[in-house]
Amino acid sequence: MSRCVNIDWLEVYACESNMNYPMNADYFRNHGYVVHEREYGTRVYSEMFTVEDQHGHAFIEVRRNPQSGSSSFTGLSELSCHLRLVNRACYANNPVRDMAEFMVKHDYIFQRIFRLDLCYDFIRFDSGDDPARFLRRYIENKFSKVNQCKVRVIGDDSWASFDWESVSWGAPTSMVGTKMYNKTKELKATGDKKPWIKQAWFESGLVDDPLNLPDVWRIEFSMHSSARNW
């Protein structure tokens, strides 16, 4: 039975090298990259921009230049930054290598992983059980899950039927969260803005036609931590 396993989010906490500092948007433009700069930053970083790859696709999102006073409660320095692979780049053949090569090329100093999402996409369980029916039985308390006692469920209530579409385990503050949901429905609901996911399903043999999809379900493990604790 075909499966498709991918990274869906890869973000690291790093430091810029003293030799290249400041590694702002102009630094990358001067090195021949196309850069898309956001007019505003984040709560922690005052600068945020996206660097394109050699094919003209968004590749790495950079957040840098900690806001004044942010170091006092986050342990950041003026060299601190976050690097995140954009979602499309996560579905490349070797996203970890791509991130590592980018960091080495520009002398970033790796500190730790900030967030990593691993996803497992499938149509049926190995036993042949239908995921939607399994989820319904779980919510009806026919099964119990060990650990991660915090549970959130989402369903679709219509005149014709009521279907459970997702269940999440773990508190929002947990280092590890688990979610099982209908990925096909999510893609359709968001306007099919991520064709690379359907392409990954096709290339792995999970689906026969990326334009005519069955219900593909996803089990996703999201691991994250503050920059100081992981």
Regions found by a protein language model. Name each.
Residues 1-230:
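Structured, helix-rich domain cores that form ligand/interaction pockets
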